């Protein structure tokens, strides 16, 4: 009888142990089969950022000024929702929210992608490019700064070359041709449209061989003035006015930039572009040629010549800048820059030509 009780107890203990082990094994198997949501989430998010700050000296109209400056402190996150669908958000901590948009690739390849939101528009070669790659400390040429709506145009206001809208873009003929077609509000960033018209922007880029591209772009729009300009006195605040632009240019690079390490893959490059347009009845035009040549280790020589005329029918609104400088890449996407610019000005810009000395440090990841 006792032996029977012992056997029953032993059997019960063994069954409990086996069932516990089986349950643990099943639990571990279930954990392995279930996706790691946190790991999957973090693998789909990419964070990037950069800061640019430095020092500047000028003697405009004979008055010497110098100041430290923090130009940009940007952080952005890109989320890959699916293989076709992504979202991007960018904020400048020294300014305002810069970009937020979603991309959806309609084609199997790169033939067609749709973008909706607030982003850098595609007019000109320079405007869509990141300041972390561009050679000049002042980033864009005068013509691009003005014509693309970066800030110097008081009629359009400060919009950093960005706008809200819908864009379709893609590559055709195995990458030989790149196109961009956008319908934008024309008002700029973080603002609702202040007229009923929408602006059309088109760009066509041909890449006949590696490193070389020929680019043309056009802008047809209607602006609503947020300020006044001395060189365009007929347009007053609140007026709707014709705002059209065109550009044509070319660029050659000896090799492509490394996406994450500019220091390790720095091409020699030369880029030239001519831009023109009209605000109301006043025409503006200008262009630039910029070159960057690696010389030794991580040191580059930068040279640029650019000119811009705010009013082609009235003398004195033109300015030509001649720049020479050095940049040293000390880590991946981080660099030190030093540049001297001689500014040759029309009488309405400055009473005499002036000097401009700039130094800047860039930290990027």
Q: What do the PLM-derived regions correspond to, one by one?
A:
Residues 41, 67, 158, 194-196, ...:
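A generic structural micro-feature
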Residues 59-63, 82, 88, 100-107, ...:
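Outer-membrane beta-barrel pore domains
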Residues 155, 191, 237:
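Charge-dense, low-complexity intrinsically disordered segments
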Residues 1-52, 103, 365:
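N-terminal periplasmic/intermembrane-space "pro-region" immediately following the signal or transit peptide
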Residues 182-191, 226-234:
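Active-site-proximal beta-alpha loop/turn segments in soluble metabolic enzymes
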Residues 192-193, 261:
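Short histidine-centered beta-strand/loop micro-motifs
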Residues 34-186, 196-201, 205-216, 220, ...:
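Outer membrane beta-barrel
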């Amino acid at each position: 009888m006792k032996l029977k009780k012992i056997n029953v107890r032993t059997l019960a203990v063994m069954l409990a142990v086996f069932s516990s082990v089986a349950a643990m094994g099943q639990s571990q198997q279930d954990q392995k089969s279930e996706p790691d949501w946190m790991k999957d989430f973090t693998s789909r998010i990419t964070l990037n950022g950069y800061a640019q700050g430095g020092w500047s000296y000028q003697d405009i109209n004979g008055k010497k000024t110098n100041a430290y400056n923090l130009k940009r402190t940007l952080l952005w996150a890109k989320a890959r929702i699916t293989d076709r669908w992504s979202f991007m958000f960018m904020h400048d901590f020294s300014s305002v929210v810069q970009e937020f948009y979603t991309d959806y690739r309609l084609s199997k390849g790169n033939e067609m992608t749709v973008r909706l939101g607030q982003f850098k528009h595609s007019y000109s070669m320079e405007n869509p490019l990141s300041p972390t790659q561009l050679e000049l400390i002042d980033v864009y040429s005068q013509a691009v700064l003005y014509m693309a709506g970066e800030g110097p145009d008081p009629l359009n206001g400060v919009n950093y070359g960005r706008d809200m809208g819908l864009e379709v873009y893609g590559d055709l003929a195995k990458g030989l041709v790149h196109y961009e077609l956008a319908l934008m509000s024309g008002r700029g960033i973080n603002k609702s449209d202040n007229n009923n018209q929408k602006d059309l922007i088109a760009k066509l880029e041909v890449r006949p061989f590696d490193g070389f591209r020929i680019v043309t772009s056009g802008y047809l729009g209607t602006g609503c003035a947020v300020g006044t300009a001395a060189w365009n006195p007929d347009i007053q605040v609140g007026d709707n006015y014709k705002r059209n632009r065109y550009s044509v240019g070319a660029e050659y690079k000896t090799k492509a930039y490394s996406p994450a390490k500019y220091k390790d893959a720095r091409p020699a490059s030369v880029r030239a572009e001519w831009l023109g347009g009209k605000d109301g009845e006043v025409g503006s035009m200008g262009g630039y040629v910029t070159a960057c040549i690696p010389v030794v280790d991580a040191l580059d020589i930068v040279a640029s010549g650019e000119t811009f005329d705010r009013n082609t029918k009235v003398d004195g609104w033109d300015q030509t800048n001649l720049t020479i400088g050095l940049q040293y890449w000390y880590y991946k996407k981080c660099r030190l820059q030093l540049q001297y610019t001689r500014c040759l000005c029309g009488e309405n810009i400055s009473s005499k030509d002036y000097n401009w000395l700039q130094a800047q440090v860039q930290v990027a990841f």
